[in-house]
Amino acid sequence: MSKVLYIKANAKPEGVSRTFKISDSFIEEYRNQKPNDEIITLDLYKEGISFLTEEAIKLHVPKQGEGKDHHVLKYAYQFAEADKYVIAAPFWNLSFPAILKAYIDYICVTGITFKYTEEGAVGLCQGKKAVHIVSRGGGYSEGPFEMYEMGDRYLRTIFGFLGITDFTTIVAEKLDVVGEDVEGILRNTIEKAKEQAKEF
């Protein structure tokens, strides 16, 4: 049985968020395929994730005797215990919502999700897999605007730093481009997400 961490990073609610329409369809199909797996949903906005403060940074190093419910380290422990990750985050201002970066600052903890050796940093989350589900208003997968896409590239890089190299992206884009069949794009992406869920 695998443990799936479903990370949601969008201020828009269910039924409004185009990203969540895709990611929820992915999760539903995954649950149908693997009903015995545990799916933990972490909605970053509902969770109230904040930026690391001076006090939090001081507590950002695990110490002997501190449990997994530690208010600063709990997200890193939760992340490390998962086997698979589904990240649902829209494309905002060439990246993703700032709350997701704040969350990443919580989960990148030496001794929990990575460590330092004489050869450099080594990820402690090896052998796991992740999928990033994203919706974009414009087209950034190819062409002249490809260089402006920094959200998926950053996630792929930071997850690789933590040892997670099996990283897939499911994207619906050009959703705000005049003349595009938006409903058709969403419909096709949802079907693609369901197919990906069967193999995840």
From Swiss-Prot:
- Asked if the keyword Flavoprotein belongs to this entry, the reply reads yes
Enzymatic class: oxidoreductase
- Cofactor note (record): Binds 1 FMN per subunit.
Which positions carry the signal peptide feature in this UniProt record? none
Q: Required co-factor? A: FMN
Q: What's the superkingdom here?
A: Bacteria
Reaction(s) the record says it catalyses: 2 a quinone + NADH + H(+) = 2 a 1,4-benzosemiquinone + NAD(+); N,N-dimethyl-1,4-phenylenediamine + anthranilate + 2 NAD(+) = 2-(4-dimethylaminophenyl)diazenylbenzoate + 2 NADH + 2 H(+)
Pfam families attached here? Answer: Flavodoxin_2 (PF02525)
Kindly state which keywords UniProt assigns to this record, in alphabetical order. Answer: Flavoprotein, FMN, NAD, Oxidoreductase
- Residues reported in the UniProt entry to bind FMN: 135-138
Q: Which residues form a coiled coil?
A: none
Q: Which InterPro entries match?
A: Flavodoxin_fold (IPR003680), Flavoprotein-like_sf (IPR029039), FMN-dep_NADH:Q_OxRdtase_AzoR1 (IPR050104), NADH:quinone_OxRdtase_FMN_depd (IPR023048)
Provide any one GO MF term from the record: oxidoreductase activity, acting on NAD(P)H, quinone or similar compound as acceptor
EC numbers for this chain: 1.6.5.-, 1.7.1.17
What role does it play? Quinone reductase that provides resistance to thiol-specific stress caused by electrophilic quinones. Also exhibits azoreductase activity. Catalyzes the reductive cleavage of the azo bond in aromatic azo compounds to the corresponding amines.
According to its UniProt record, which protein family does this protein belong to? Belongs to the azoreductase type 1 family.
Q: Its quaternary structure? A: Homodimer.
Which protein are we looking at?
FMN-dependent NADH:quinone oxidoreductase 2
Organism of this sequence: Clostridium acetobutylicum (strain ATCC 824 / DSM 792 / JCM 1419 / IAM 19013 / LMG 5710 / NBRC 13948 / NRRL B-527 / VKM B-1787 / 2291 / W)
